[in-house]
A protein has these predicted regions:
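Metal-dependent phosphodiesterase/phospholipase catalytic core, i.e.
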Residues: 1-96, 108-120, 129-140, 152-154
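C-terminal active-site rim and adjoining tail of enzyme catalytic domains
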Residues: 91, 98-200
């Protein structure tokens, strides 16, 4: 687990890339752009944000080891246009306190870069696919077996987040998800070991 250390500052993206390359290990990175449709002047605009990420990834030669994910799909659209060699993952959540899908409104969600769920018969996997993402990463409680099956027909990689309970990890592995995002990789490794799955 992380521990706070007074006086420490977060590493820059380039510093992180250098550290990973110096390790000699085949580490992959899932980079999340922390942007919202309501960010306003508090953050760079989506195109500038995407350019900054793409420039850092390319400068470090890390394109094959990076996926860029976001709830705000505007940055993902720009990343896809600027650097189609960099993978993108569409994040979604439908909960009482945070809902990027806005299924009940019937209108396009501001999180989805103009994409409208209604144009895809209410299918979130189809909307993700139409957006250009090849990975769909949803709040784990929102994933259904029907959605997973539909995502499979669209050849989407399915990565639920953030799964910290070993029983839920086991259930989702049995369903056939492609991977799991967790705060506790040691727990996931234990579940994988129990299931005799190869460890990364």
């Amino acid at each position: 687990q992380q521990r706070a250390a007074d006086g420490e500052r977060p590493a820059t993206l380039l510093e992180l890339f250098d550290l990973i390359k110096s390790s000699g290990k085949p580490v992959r990175l899932n980079l999340e752009t922390k942007l919202t449709p309501e960010s306003g002047a508090a953050t760079p605009d989506p195109l500038t944000f995407a350019r900054l990420v793409v420039d850092a990834v390319r400068a470090s030669g890390m394109a094959e080891r990076v996926t860029v994910q976001s709830f705000d799909w505007r940055t993902l659209r720009h990343v896809h246009t600027l650097a189609p060699e960099i993978g993108t993952a569409c994040l979604t959540i439908e909960s009482e306190n945070f809902d990027t899908v806005r299924r009940k409104t019937g209108a396009p969600s501001p999180w989805h870069a103009g994409g409208n769920l209604a144009d895809h018969a209410g299918s979130l996997p189809k909307l993700v696919h139409a957006s250009g993402c090849r990975t769909w990463s949803m709040f784990w409680r929102n994933l259904t077996q029907a959605d997973l099956a539909e995502a499979r027909t669209l050849r989407l990689t399915v990565l639920p987040w953030t799964v910290n309970d070993p029983a839920e990890m086991a259930r989702l592995i049995d369903w056939g998800v492609d991977g799991i995002i967790t705060d506790y990789p040691n727990r996931l490794r234990d579940v994988m070991t129990e299931k005799k799955l190869p460890l990364p």
